[in-house]
């Protein structure tokens, strides 16, 4: 590929294999690809892969922790000694759940959750809301840094928690189903529902849909499941839901900062 740049001197074999697998697909042969310095093997696809896929999007490439990022809060010239740091550690461990833990009660309402196209597919939405203000696991962290001018900064690194994973998994599975030929099935299903409602035959819709699905014959996608992509209206729905996950992730970091500052 002529339009490929790698900003890393060393790449592990598994990551290199994942890059080659993706670039060997006809759907991506003309894409502009950049491999970031933090490149490493991921689940199903390489981490650090950046590309212009045109009108396509691969949810699995975007990843499951949608909106993962950092929040920087200025603490001014506040003095941090052993006592203060111990207090900070106690506050974080007491009031900011980590790992798979969430708050016992909701810290804030996140009304945008119901605006997700895939909202009805989510599991335990009440628990999702209770995860706002939680750290999670992996490489997520909370720390205090000191700048050259002596200013202290509270740094919070976390993302959209289980919401991002559920949304990513739903849309990657949808991408696979569509590439199995179900886009035609879904279009026919929508038309069937509209036609039956217009004809006053609502009671027959369920059985008609079952018959439609029974007669469906899937095709084998040319791409691995992890690299199937979305286009058209499904791409737009995913991007819409991804933006909501990004807002969720941002509010998660803000809530953590508020919790810490309120107890210090």
Predicted features along the sequence, with ranges:
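Glycine-rich, flexible loop motifs
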Residues: 1-33, 53-61, 66-149, 165-264
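Short glycine-rich or small-residue beta-strand-to-loop segments that form or flank ligand, phosphate
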Residues: 34, 153-157
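Short acidic, Gly/Ser-rich segments with clustered Asp/Glu that frequently serve as metal-coordination loops
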Residues: 41-42, 69, 159-164
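An anion-binding catalytic pocket shared by soluble metabolic enzymes
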Residues: 41-52, 57-58
């Amino acid at each position: 590929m002529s339009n490929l740049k790698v900003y890393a001197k060393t790449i592990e074999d598994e990551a290199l294999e994942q890059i080659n697998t993706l670039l060997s697909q006809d759907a991506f042969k003309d894409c502009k690809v950049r491999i970031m310095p933090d490149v490493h093997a991921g689940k199903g696809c390489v981490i650090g892969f950046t590309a212009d896929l045109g009108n396509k999007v691969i949810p699995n490439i975007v990843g499951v922790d949608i909106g993962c990022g950092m929040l920087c809060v200025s603490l001014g010239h506040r003095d941090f000694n052993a006592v203060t740091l111990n207090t900070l550690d106690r506050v974080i461990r007491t009031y900011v759940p980590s790992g798979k833990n969430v708050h016992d009660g909701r810290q804030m309402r996140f009304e945008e959750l119901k605006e997700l196209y895939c909202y009805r597919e989510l599991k335990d939405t009440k628990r999702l809301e209770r995860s706002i203000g939680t750290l999670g696991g992996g490489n997520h962290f909370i720390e205090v840094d000191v700048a050259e001018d002596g200013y202290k900064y509270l740094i919070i690194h976390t993302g959209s928690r289980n919401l991002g994973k559920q949304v990513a998994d739903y849309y990657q599975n949808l991408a696979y189903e569509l590439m199995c030929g179900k886009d035609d099935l879904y279009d026919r299903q929508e038309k069937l529902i509209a036609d039956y409602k217009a004809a006053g035959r609502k009671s027959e819709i369920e059985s008609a849909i079952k018959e439609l699905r029974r007669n469906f014959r899937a095709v084998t996608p040319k791409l691995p499941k992890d690299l199937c992509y979305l286009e058209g209206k499904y791409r737009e729905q995913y991007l819409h839901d991804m933006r909501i996950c990004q807002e969720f992730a941002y509010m998660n970091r803000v809530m953590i900062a508020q919790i810490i500052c309120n107890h210090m």
